[in-house]
Amino acid sequence: MTIQYTFSMIKPDAIKRNKIGQVNAYLENGGLKIVAQKMRFLTKYEAECFYDEHRARTFFNSLVEYITSGAVVLQVLKGEDAIILNRTIMGATNPAEAEAGTIRKDLGESIEANSIHGSDSENSAKREIAFFFNKSEIIE
């Protein structure tokens, strides 16, 4: 097992429904430590850059519009095999297909409004953490 860092973003739908504490409880009870966290609004430009890999997809514009529709909570998580562990705690992208007891099954509303984003690989985690955090913001 390897100690890893991963990135997580609590999405506007969860924040509008006051679910930050519940999402954090899933993460912490699942074995992850929150080592950085901040709440803010993303600009359209930031959202477009962050989701650039999806730019050619049909859902890109609606994704950018959704993620900039309200505040988000940006997080750095730490733990043993944190990337896979976070993906397991989050559940499948589509809440209808996610397992019971996962964030997306229990709190998600739709594929887009599924309450949380998490890095899907080591490379993504490094890129996404660096996109929003500098090293001084990550508390060990």
Curated annotation (Swiss-Prot):
Coiled-coil zones: none
A biological process term (GO) from this entry: UTP biosynthetic process
Transmembrane segments: none
UniProt KW Cell inner membrane keyword: no
Predominant subcellular localization, coarse grouping: cytoplasm
GO molecular function, one term: metal ion binding
Cofactor: Mg(2+)
UniProt keyword annotations, A-Z: ATP-binding, Cytoplasm, Kinase, Magnesium, Metal-binding, Nucleotide metabolism, Nucleotide-binding, Phosphoprotein, Transferase
Binding site for ATP: 11, 59, 87, 93, 104, 114
Family matches, as InterPro entries: NDK-like_dom (IPR034907), NDK-like_dom_sf (IPR036850), Nucleoside_diP_kinase (IPR001564), Nucleoside_diP_kinase_AS (IPR023005)
Source organism superkingdom: Bacteria
Enzyme Commission number(s): 2.7.4.6
Metal-binding is among the record's keywords: yes
Active site annotation, chain numbering: 117 (pros-phosphohistidine intermediate)
Localization per record: Cytoplasm
Reaction catalysed by this enzyme: a 2'-deoxyribonucleoside 5'-diphosphate + ATP = a 2'-deoxyribonucleoside 5'-triphosphate + ADP; a ribonucleoside 5'-diphosphate + ATP = a ribonucleoside 5'-triphosphate + ADP
GO cellular component: cytoplasm
Family per similarity comment: Belongs to the NDK family.
Oligomeric form and interacting partners: Homotetramer.
Its biological purpose: Major role in the synthesis of nucleoside triphosphates other than ATP. The ATP gamma phosphate is transferred to the NDP beta phosphate via a ping-pong mechanism, using a phosphorylated active-site intermediate.
Protein's recorded name: Nucleoside diphosphate kinase
Gene it is expressed from: ndk
